[in-house]
């Protein structure tokens, strides 16, 4: 067997195992109190040994656990957590998208919308520029670094934990590096930057990810005053210099405030 055929066979087996595992999760979702292994195997059209092996893998990853009845399995709260994250993202996009579309039409630039996800931001919505001037490399589902993206800086600036920044900086030393000559990589420098962001309520990526591209971001507050989402507009440095920061910031801030109001924030 040549190496190409072997690799293709391994890939096929991996896909097959993934599909079978997902099928087991789907079946278990209909049995909140648990389902016996024999019945699971029957419903999934698998032999018991294969079903048991897949369930062990799912259990190791925290998606299933033994039920009260001997030989039965049930889903864990981890599955619910994933579903809630998806639902949360879908709900916020439903709320925010009309305002983001209006901003896109007014400014003509790339509109980005992200959610805080632990030590990263994740792009959950994006609108391409209507002026055709600049298309960025960012995409929906992309994880954004906190230290060098405008929206990431927003999340760092409004982080409630006092010691979070120091912990983040220490634990991400391999990740924190110069992407361009403008990227901030010193802790003292980012502290000054974040203080300015808190005072002005907006953040900028000044060619810190990509030369020639800049970004302006504003926080979105929920009813508890937490910043779980952020909005940003990307443009060429040429257009920023031509029209000035204020020409863009006013509309971005207005949009962020509108979405914040929709989320129940009243301190505007």
Curated annotation (Swiss-Prot):
Keyword Transcription regulation: yes
Gene Ontology MF terms in the entry: DNA binding; DNA-binding transcription factor activity
Disulphide connectivity of cysteines: none
Domain IclR-ED: 92-265
Pfam families recorded: HTH_IclR, IclR_C
Record's keyword terms, sorted: DNA-binding, Transcription, Transcription regulation
DNA-binding region: 37-56
InterPro entries listed in its UniProt record: GAF-like_dom_sf (IPR029016), HTH_MetabolicPath_Reg (IPR050707), Tscrpt_reg_IclR_C (IPR014757), Tscrpt_reg_IclR_N (IPR005471), WH-like_DNA-bd_sf (IPR036388), WH_DNA-bd_sf (IPR036390)
Domain HTH iclR-type: 15-77
PANTHER family, A to Z: DNA-BINDING TRANSCRIPTIONAL REPRESSOR YIAJ, HELIX-TURN-HELIX TRANSCRIPTIONAL REGULATOR, ICLR FAMILY
Protein name: Uncharacterized HTH-type transcriptional regulator HI_1032
Organism: Haemophilus influenzae (strain ATCC 51907 / DSM 11121 / KW20 / Rd)
